[in-house]
Amino acid sequence: MTRPVIALLLVLAIACSASANLDGCLVMMTSPTEVLPGGTYTFSFWVQNESQDGEGIATIQISFPDGYTIFEGTMACDEIVVGRPSFDMYIPPIDHTAIWEDNNGGTGEILPTEGTTVYIDATVADVSYGTPIFWCVQGDGAGDEVHEVCGCIQVAINPVEDLSWTAIKALYR
């Protein structure tokens, strides 16, 4: 019997120029490392601000593929210092996007050289193989353009047969 296993490949796409405010900022999925269709998992993403001119990250968006179910009540983030980051966390209606948004209107919540982890639970779609999870971070508007950096994390399928030599050999291909 073949059981599909989705391997989450951490493909980092950083789309910013050398002089951009958010140059070097990134989002990386740290868990889970693999999932099964129909399973519910806590997805965690490391968000790092490497702005070269002082811009803070004010908004983080993680967009899951169609068919995923995300659970707003499970959204969380790690504090960098007590009371910060202080994000409003929500999921817009009719969307598969989780948003962590600065709620005090000041400088961004993740300052240059800082990073934090954001979390959300999601049920994996049965038919989303090869569809990426997209991410965007928006800055607080300080300094020069570019105030947004986006990328994706590729989701791929790796079908293997349970309890067989084929399954074991597939790990080494």
Regions found by a protein language model. Give the residues of each.
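Boundary/junction segments of secreted and surface-exposed precursor proteins
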Residues: C16-T42, C136, I157-R173
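Low-complexity, intrinsically disordered segments enriched in Ser/Thr together with acidic residues
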Residues: I99-T131
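Intrinsic-disorder/low-complexity, polar/charged segments enriched in Ser/Thr/Lys/Arg/Asp/Glu/Gln
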Residues: G38-S44, T59, T97, G115-Y119, ...
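Low-complexity, serine/threonine/proline/glycine-rich extracellular segments that form mucin-like
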Residues: N21, E34-V82
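Serine/threonine-enriched low-complexity regions used as flexible
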Residues: A122-I153
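A surface/secretory-pathway sequence property marking extracellular, secreted
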Residues: T59, D66-G106, H147-I153
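Positively charged n-region of N-terminal signal peptides that target proteins for export
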Residues: M1-P4
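Bacterial N-terminal signal peptides
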Residues: A7-S17
